[in-house]
Amino acid sequence: MNKAKVNERMIFDYEERRNALLADGYRLRHETILSDGVICRLHHMANGNDIILSAKANQLQQKTNNVVVHTQNYDEADKMRQY
């Protein structure tokens, strides 16, 4: 398996898990891009637990065309569905 295929699989796993959590009632609390990767924090409204997902920034950007959001406004983040 070449490197490109590995990266595509990593991106798919990251997005699949994030979307599954959103579908299960988790809400996007904060998502930001760092120098070494992407952190996606999902906040569960029922019990307050946070789940953190991450993927390398360059891999995720190749897939999403740089639609990585950075916001502290939870209401605004909840409305964003540009995955």
Residue spans of the language-model regions?
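Terminus-proximal functional modules
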Residues: M1-Y83
